[in-house]
Amino acid sequence: MDLKNGIADKEGLLSIEGSVEKIIYQNEENGYTVCEIFTPSDEIFTLVGNMPYLSEGETVSALGSWVNHATFGKQFKVEFYEKQLPATETAILKYLASGAVRGIGKVTAQRIVSQFGADSFEVIEHNPQWLSEIPGISPKKAEQISASFAAQFGMRNVMMFCREYFGPTTAVRIYKKWGNGALERIKQNPYILCGEIYGVGFEKADAIAKDLGMKKNAPERIAMGLKYVLMHNAASNGHSFLPLDKLCAVAKRLLSCEMNEIEDEAAALETRGEIVCVRHEGMKCAYLRDYYEAEKYTAEKLCALDRAGKNLGEDNVLSLISMVERESNMEYAVLQKRAICQAASNGVFILTGGPGTGKTTVVRAIIRVFDAMGLRIALAAPTGRAAKRMSQSAGEEAKTVHRLLEMEYGAEDKLRFRKNENDQLEDDVIIIDEASMLDLMLTDALLKAIKPGARLILIGDVNQLPPVGAGHVFDDIIKSDRFATVELTHIFRQAQESLIVTNAHAVNHGEYMNLESKSGDFFFLPRQEDAQTAATIAELCKKRLPKSYGLTVFDGIQVITPSRKGDAGTEMLNSALQSVINPPARGKAEKKVRDFTLREGDKVMQIKNNYDIEWNKNGTQGFGIFNGDIGVIKKIDLSEELITVDFEDKICEYDYTMLDELELAYAITVHKSQGSEYPIVIMPLYRYTPKLLTRNLLYTAITRAQSIVILVGNGEVAKAMVDNNRQTKRYTGLRYALEKYD
């Protein structure tokens, strides 16, 4: 940049330059910095923006605009910046003494500048061996100093290259992974960004490759295109593999290359071991290696646990059941007793059943029986909400599976679990609730952490929707007919009084619901027009339900809808509900994101797993906010470009580059509601696309309610959903892997 203070530059931005006098604040994760600079005109200004690795004593040139902060006054908001090396001995000394270069403190900085003066940087960069002439600097330390110095400007180069494609947070991640060689690696093959750097997909890497002049049929591009199709279908459609011909056909549409080029590269990927091809029912199928290994291990470990499960003796177990019955002053049904005995007789046991069939009662009894035997028991569920509900119903602490496995970060900030095959859980019995939500990769991690001889009990409702991630583990295990399974079917008298329970079972059996009742816990409000449906839902959330039940959308009411689109989809409903529940107001900050606005006080949802976001809960720090977690925006700092969200007392900060991970949550999709329960559930009924008018989607939605279900809209839609028992096919191979262990 050719900069002079205050002169307008490209895109209408202003330019400024000066030496950094003071770093007021710096976020190491995303590079957000607040600093004071001293300009050539002897003025001091405050700069704010993403300026990673900026240090006192450096000279900075920046493009941006002037803003007025409500508390701190006039500031220069930086859009683009460059660092320049200090030129004078005084500035060089200040920079080196600031701690910016690892291995150089104030004393060492003084010695270096005293010896080499204005040539200090030249020596550090190109002749580091000369530094060993200075007392206290060994040849090894001299090399470390030189490497640290180079890192400062390697980061600058990465930031400059990435600013056309990514936000600063992604640029920092790239530099942390590959260091000074990052740009060389990216320019050789930009597709290495896919799968290696969080938040970078194929389309973005493809744009970089195009700008770098890479050919459309380059092997690197075709290889990543094929792997991307597999990755996308695992993450978005739940497939652990794809038929090879389907994979190549989808990749052809994505890449616009010839089929023979794609088939050749698929064969090369198989030869290199990057994908694994096997035959299922005579069809050649392609896996990403991690998913193939996970299916193989899951089958092997499940069978090993089942074989090793010690039968604790039916007479002994029945005696303990009688003891528990006396303690609780109740008598278990025949099928419930069978379930308890099966849990004590097998290494792997599956308990399934719909609402009101007594699953919770059985789980409490199983816990009590194993506890009486002196066995160590761990309770867990896939989501935080499900774990919290399990704790309440079982009367024992339950953790998320991630917490049970002690999630942490290893080299290169990669997620890993401290509990694994090398450091297994000490518990003798592992009980997992909402097991229908377990995807393949989480199941693989869980099984690796279970010690030989321990028992695994999986509890869930097989009629719920499949997990969001790849695989259909719970369903595949049950359908394999390989493990002891009890399905509870009897609806107990108290549950029979609930229309939620009876209507849920009616739906599950293909029968129409009772929508005529005007009292109880299940209501239907007929509306013919989608706009009327949305207006009624807004009125229910804003006035009628808070007045009648004392609950709000923040503490008990959840709108659940099958679709994102349409007048009664999440996008339109969230906009309508936000306008009546949390409208704009003076002093209430807001930020436009994509096609909606986030506002202080809004109910929001995390829509993708973020394992590296930091949270603080009552002074305790941790990492990870997960897909489906719901919180409330507490603060939007427009000057620092940060949004603070409270996820049930876990306080997190999002910079603006992370806002694609949040969306409004006054209304959520049925898929996002999995594993959660709410006191009041409202569901719109309108003409969705046929693939969403399914029985198990309706069943999942109404079983999310603890106390009240309200359906609003067209009653014929409810009938159409009951009639449609279609389920989207998932390509999963666990059942095939289990067959090998019969």
Where are these regions (language model features)?
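ASCE P-loop NTPase helicase motor core
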Residues: K337-I340, S345-K518
